[in-house]
From Swiss-Prot:
It is an enzyme of class 2 (transferase). Homotetramer. Forms heterodimers with either ThiH or ThiS. CDD domains: ThiG (cd04728). Pfam families: ThiG. The active site is at residue 110. It is found in: Cytoplasm. Keywords: Cytoplasm, Schiff base, Thiamine biosynthesis, Transferase. Belongs to the ThiG family. Its main location: cytoplasm. Catalyzes the rearrangement of 1-deoxy-D-xylulose 5-phosphate (DXP) to produce the thiazole phosphate moiety of thiamine. Sulfur is provided by the thiocarboxylate moiety of the carrier protein ThiS. In vitro, sulfur can be provided by H(2)S. The gene is thiG. 1-deoxy-D-xylulose 5-phosphate binds at residues 171, 197-198, 219-220. This is Thiazole synthase.
Length: 267
């Protein structure tokens, strides 16, 4: 029994902590592109996620005459993460999040300032400027950014509570396109690093976690799957598998074969 307890302890992992908030799930999902809020709620439950992004400019939170997200997903049960999807200037992003705080009292927010509607890459100069304003205003800022280690360091230095580099363009489903840069960001960063955007299927989520990311955020990969609920469940297992694999440490790659059964002592 003592050996079993020791083994269980060895397999334990530290929880994800963002701005003093603790999460057991390392998967974050969104609220866009689902057919209904009911489907979104089912996917959320299947995913095991505890945090869900909310596009303040697009999601109905308050109008009782139309379907409301809060009628299906309660902020008492999940951490709502207001984001600035659709904002193309720092001023617009700051204004949106200030309105979100007035409406729901949210201080933990996700900042994204986009550049071009075609590729939705972040405008890093505007992102940095907006992040500084929000942090001075008392927000805990999780920030969507490029996979540039230099900008990632600057965002951490000004006080962002999580760095969220893209794996590929938003909604592209291309998977992790620049694992080298993602790894560089992980190695230099003390706050959580969460891949945001580009995940297309479960194996992409596993790759992100095997690189050493603290979490993965996704929306389209689940919402546009043929079976969103099943894909949400797949993503749940993929994130866990990737994290376990990272903690276990993979075997070294070798140029030549190495037999599984020792050759010594053969009859």
């Amino acid at each position: 029994m003592e050996d079993a307890v020791t083994m269980d302890t060895a397999f334990e992992d530290k929880p994800l902590v963002v701005a003093g908030r603790t999460f057991t799930s390392r998967l974050i999902i969104g609220t866009g592109k689902y057919k209904t809020y009911a489907q979104n709620a089912q996917a959320l439950e299947a995913s095991g996620a505890e945090m869900i992004t909310v596009a303040i400019r697009r999601v109905n939170l308050s109008n009782p005459d139309e379907p409301r997200l809060v009628d299906f997903i309660s902020p008492d049960d999940y951490t709502f993460l207001p984001n600035t999807a659709g904002c193309f200037t720092g001023e617009d992003a700051v204004r949106t999040l200030r309105l979100a705080r007035e409406a729901g009292g949210w201080n933990l927010v996700k900042l994204e300032v986009l550049s071009d509607p075609k590729h939705l890459y972040p405008d890093m100069a505007e992102t940095l400027r907006a992040a500084e304003l929000l942090i001075k205003d008392g927000f805990d800022v999780m920030v969507y950014c490029s996979d540039d280690p230099v900008y990632a360091r600057k965002l951490e230095e000004i006080g962002c509570c999580a760095i969220m580099p893209l794996g590929a363009p938003i909604g592209s489903g291309l998977g992790i396109q620049n694992p080298v840069n993602i790894r560089l960001i992980i190695e230099q960063t003390k706050v959580p690093v969460i891949v945001d955007a580009g995940v297309g299927t479960a194996s992409d989520a596993t790759v992100a976690m095997e690189l050493g990311c603290d979490g993965v955020l996704m929306n389209t990969a689940i919402a546009e799957a043929k079976d969103p609920i099943r894909m949400a469940r797949a993503m749940r297992h993929a994130v866990i598998a990737g994290r376990e694999s990272y903690l276990a440490g993979r075997m070294p790659k070798k140029r030549y074969a190495d037999p599984s059964s020792p050759l010594s002592g053969l009859i």
